[in-house]
């Protein structure tokens, strides 16, 4: 059976996902077969495996760092909030049903067998399984029948390392307080703590570390510095939405929808020379930009209503009149059409809502979800404005409940030629007659370096700017970032001690 290690945190966003990613790469570098595992993930940022199954993006990133293909076994339960009160429950990569919190808590104990089966599947096929907890193990109102923190650690008999975020302030109190709220059996399972996101002189920190060890009777296994690494984040709890950039040569505005999903779609754009990204948050104006992107969302009708309530629809139409480029991805693509219908109330109580009217499509939210790894061809139907995109193949993935239908003489954006390794021929997306508005269901399209370069060069040419010769290969860039992350974390942690802890639990 594999070695096991579980990373838990004092709160959400303390760095659990990133540390698990780093450990996966470290163990890979050490010649071990390693797999990540998170029993239950709540996130709108998801990923589609090559079998067409949906998991949390964090586990896909961790698998990539481990050098293996993502699998539904790594994240058997995915919760995708669709409103303030309900979440879509995805089990082993497939939609189960929408549930309220109360309904899910009653249902949750039935999932233990499924969780154990998937963990054992990984443990039998790997040398190490690195487990990620969720939120905090000290949420005392949720501890009963826990399946994601200490309950999971006990189920699979894994040692726990507790992570605290010093950048937030109060790290000693958060670690000591967490330990206080654990029962004796749970405290005994915590084998050490990690201080994350440290800035400054570590010598000043050392006396505090010694005092903390005396208080909690656990060793500090390392202090990880604040890291500026470019690796996909798990969910929307991120600073990216509130970072304001100076004006660039090409300014791209992205609307931060209330239920934004797969926001990592736009990370490759941040690596394109001369491109500046700004997120338009609730209550803010779009302002001037060269490209406006409306991203994916878990609640298209609800988010479109919010967009209209804040008057952003008028700003979008104004940008259209100015000849700016407007791009929609998945739910954002649906919003650009004439109408969105939800006859089965999958996402909303509203059966129908008028769209922005910028593309000749009608969307119907269906009961069945399309999930696939996708390859598509950008054909001759594209207008001359986008002529440099003609003939390109792009890869990405689809996750959508809706189906969109071209109206009248409207034109599609691409032809899907492959889904989950099977040959198909399916029309995707839509494009306006002048090519300045287009939408697609394909997430990850900007990870295609040639597509991104050609599209940005179209904008640059219109502004009289020199075209880019090349843009960074984002997939190669990610690989280098995994190695850089692993080197920082390896040099910050007592890896010899961590190996000893894992070996000790192998025999328990």
Curated annotation (Swiss-Prot):
It holds the Pfam family CbiA. The active site is at residues 330, 443. Pathway: Cofactor biosynthesis; adenosylcobalamin biosynthesis. CDD domains: CobQ_N, GATase1_CobQ. Residues 249-451 form the GATase cobBQ-type domain. This is Cobyric acid synthase. One of its GO terms (biological process) is cobalamin biosynthetic process. It comes from Caldanaerobacter subterraneus subsp. tengcongensis (strain DSM 15242 / JCM 11007 / NBRC 100824 / MB4). The keyword Cytoplasm does not apply. Catalyzes amidations at positions B, D, E, and G on adenosylcobyrinic A,C-diamide. NH(2) groups are provided by glutamine, and one molecule of ATP is hydrogenolyzed for each amidation. One of its GO terms (molecular function) is catalytic activity.
């Amino acid at each position: 059976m594999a070695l096991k290690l579980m990373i838990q945190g004092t709160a959400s966003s303390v760095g659990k996902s990133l540390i698990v990613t780093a450990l996966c790469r470290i163990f890979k570098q050490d010649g071990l077969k390693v797999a990540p595992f998170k029993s239950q993930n709540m996130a709108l940022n998801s990923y589609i495996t090559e079998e067409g199954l949906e998991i949390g993006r964090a586990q896909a990133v961790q698998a990539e760092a481990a050098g293996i293909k993502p699998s539904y076994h790594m994240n058997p339960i995915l919760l995708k909030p669709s409103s303030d009160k309900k979440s879509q429950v995805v089990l082993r990569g497939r939609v189960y049903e929408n549930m309220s919190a109360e309904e899910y808590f009653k249902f949750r104990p039935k999932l233990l067998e499924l969780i154990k089966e998937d963990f054992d599947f990984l443990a039998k096929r790997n040398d190490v399984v690195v487990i990620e907890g969720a939120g905090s193990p000290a949420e005392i109102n949720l501890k009963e029948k826990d399946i994601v923190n200490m309950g999971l650690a006990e189920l699979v008999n894994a040692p726990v390392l507790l992570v605290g975020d010093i950048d937030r302030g109060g790290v000693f109190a958060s670690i000591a307080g967490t330990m206080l709220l654990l029962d004796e059996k749970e405290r005994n399972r915590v084998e050490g703590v990690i201080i994350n996101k440290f800035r400054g002189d570590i010598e000043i920190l050392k006396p505090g570390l010694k005092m903390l060890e005396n208080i909690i009777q656990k060793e500090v296994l390392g202090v990880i510095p604040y890291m500026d690494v470019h690796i996909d984040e798990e969910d929307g709890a991120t600073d990216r939405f509130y970072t304001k950039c100076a004006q660039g040569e090409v300014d791209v505005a992205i609307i931060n929808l209330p239920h934004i999903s797969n926001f990592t779609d736009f990370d490759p754009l941040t690596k394109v020379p001369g491109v500046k990204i700004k997120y338009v948050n609730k209550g803010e104006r779009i302002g001037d930009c060269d490209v406006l992107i409306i991203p994916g969302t878990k609640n298209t009708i609800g988010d479109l209503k919010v967009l209209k309530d804040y008057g952003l629809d008028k700003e979008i139409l104004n940008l259209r009149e100015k000849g700016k480029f407007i791009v929609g991805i998945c739910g954002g693509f649906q919003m650009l059409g004439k109408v969105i219908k939800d006859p089965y109330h999958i996402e909303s109580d509203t059966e129908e809502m008028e769209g922005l009217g910028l593309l000749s499509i009608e969307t119907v939210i269906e009961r069945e979800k399309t999930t696939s790894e996708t390859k598509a061809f950008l054909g001759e139907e594209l207008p001359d404005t986008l002529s440099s995109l003609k003939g390109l193949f792009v890869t990405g993935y689809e996750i959508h409940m809706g189906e969109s239908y071209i109206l009248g003489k409207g034109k599609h954006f691409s032809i899907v030629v492959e889904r989950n390794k099977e040959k198909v021929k399916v029309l995707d997306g839509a494009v306006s007659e002048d090519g300045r508005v287009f939408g697609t269901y394909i997430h990850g399209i900007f990870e295609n370096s040639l597509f991104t370069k050609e599209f940005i060069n179209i904008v640059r040419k219109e502004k009289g700017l020199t075209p880019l010769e090349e843009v960074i290969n984002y997939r190669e860039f990610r690989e280098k970032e995994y190695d850089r992350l692993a080197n920082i974390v390896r040099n910050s942690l007592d890896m010899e001690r961590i190996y000893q802890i894992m070996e000790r639990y192998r025999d328990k």
